[in-house]
From Swiss-Prot:
Binding site for Mg(2+): 131, 161
Organism: Xenopus laevis (African clawed frog)
Principal location listed in the UniProt entry: nucleus
Function summary: DNA repair enzyme that can remove a variety of covalent adducts from DNA through hydrolysis of a 5'-phosphodiester bond, giving rise to DNA with a free 5' phosphate. Catalyzes the hydrolysis of dead-end complexes between DNA and the topoisomerase 2 (top2) active site tyrosine residue. Hydrolyzes 5'-phosphoglycolates on protruding 5' ends on DNA double-strand breaks (DSBs) due to DNA damage by radiation and free radicals.
Cofactor note: Binds 1 magnesium or manganese ion per subunit.
Active site per the UniProt annotation: 271 (proton donor/acceptor)
Coiled coil segments of this chain: none
Name of encoding gene: tdp2
Signal peptide: none
GO MF annotation terms: 5'-tyrosyl-DNA phosphodiesterase activity; magnesium ion binding; manganese ion binding; nuclease activity; single-stranded DNA binding
Family membership noted in the UniProt record: Belongs to the CCR4/nocturin family. TTRAP/TDP2 subfamily.
UniProt name for this protein: Tyrosyl-DNA phosphodiesterase 2
Stretches for region Interaction with 5' end of substrate DNA: 129-133, 235-240, 273-275
GO cellular component: cytoplasm; PML body
Cofactor(s) in the UniProt record: Mg(2+); Mn(2+)
Length: 371
């Protein structure tokens, strides 16, 4: 694509910078949506070069007529087809009792679900790397994630590796949740807070200055059943080679947890990419911060959240079983206590496409509120 044809002014240093930036935007848009750069240019120009608005516009149901007029070769792009199918679905209240009752035979009755939802003495929490960067079978996998939300109706959800189209899909499907994100471009973390249970007080994004992978710490101060809770999620630097940066990021997380007001319970959850030896290398966690899996007696059934022995999404030719996804907890030093009670894996059922919702298992945790 010629920059001149994109309508950019051809002269002047400042204008050249704008043209270069718009070229980059076209490339990023094309990468996220799977369209070619000419189509990207059209959507961006129509939306005043606002990336989020352009992506939302592209994935609106009204884009169907545009796609129908495109060559068959363009329609064959898997990501475009699947994400278009996803975002064409009607809005669904994922905490609806009827939906929960029909999503799985594991739910034996509506009454028990409703009772659980109305019980102010506990809340449920889910953290999950949903692998939005994997374009394969993304529609079926996204629906499976929403089925898990409908089944378990967690009050708080932390997600990692969310991409803009996936986020828009969740906003359309999960209308019972308020969704806040750690970024808007490329891929990022997100929190989903059930509107009927969780009151958002404030939010903050804490940067990791030396990250090479656009990682940060998303923080939300909330109130659940009268209890002040500081929620934190992050996707720490990936791969064994980036251990040093990962531990710097962990240090930021731990300091932020310890600096939270003493009246607040602090819950961190996310894809930490941590190896046990890395935690040992820094002398373990501070005395006031607990690893929930360890606190609950190291249950074997949910030890590994990254498990290529059982999860074939990566199609790895090796076996790797690691506890990448972790929940850390700092108790309130005043008033009522929020105590972790139970931990389980989600997303472990293979889908019709032969794959799982993500290459990670999700971690579902029940917390009791003790007055």
């Amino acid at each position: 694509m010629e920059v001149e044809e994109a309508g950019a002014v051809q002269t002047g240093t400042g204008e050249a910078v704008v043209a270069n930036e718009r070229t980059k935007q076209c490339s990023a848009f094309a990468s996220i949506t799977g369209c070619d750069e000419a189509v990207a240019q059209c959507f961006l120009a129509e939306n005043d070069w606002d990336m989020e608005r352009a992506i939302n516009s592209y994935f609106e149901p009204g884009v169907e007529s545009t796609l129908q007029n495109k060559p068959a070769a363009d329609l064959a792009d898997p990501l475009k087809q699947e994400m278009h199918a996803v975002t064409s679905d009607a809005c669904i209240d994922l905490t609806s009792d009827d939906l929960v009752a029909t999503k799985s035979e594991a739910v034996t009755s509506n009454s028990s679900t409703v009772k659980q939802q109305e019980d102010e003495s506990h809340f449920t929490f889910l953290t999950w790397n949903i692998d939005g960067l994997d374009e394969s079978n993304v529609a079926e996998r996204a629906r499976a994630v929403c089925s898990c939300l409908a089944l378990y109706t967690p009050d708080v959800v932390f997600l990692q590796e969310v991409i803009p189209p996936y986020c828009e899909y969740l906003k359309k499907r999960a209308v019972s949740y308020k969704i806040i994100t750690g970024n808007e471009d490329e891929y990022f973390t997100a929190m989903m807070l059930k509107k009927s249970r969780v009151k958002l007080i404030s939010q903050e994004i804490v940067p990791y200055p030396s990250t090479l992978m656009m990682r940060n710490l998303l923080v939300a101060n909330v109130n659940i059943s009268g209890n002040s809770i500081c929620l934190m999620t992050s996707h720490l630097e990936s791969t064994k080679d980036h251990s040093k940066e990962r531990l710097k990021q962990l240090d930021t997380v731990l300091k932020k947890m310890m600096d939270a007001p003493p009246s607040a319970t602090v819950i961190f959850g996310g894809d930490t990419n941590l190896r046990d030896q890395e935690v040992a290398k820094i002398g373990g966690l501070p005395n006031t911060i607990l690893d929930v899996w360890e606190f609950l007696g190291k249950p074997e059934h949910c030890r590994y959240t990254w498990d290529t022995k059982l999860n074939n999404n990566l199609r790895a030719c090796y076996t790797s079983r690691l506890r990448f996804d972790r929940i850390l907890y700092r108790a309130s030093m005043e008033g009522s206590q929020v105590i972790p009670q139970f931990l389980n894996l989600v997303g472990t059922e293979k889908l019709d496409c032969g794959r799982f919702p993500s290459d990670h298992w999700g971690l579902l945790c029940d917390f009791d509120i003790i007055l």
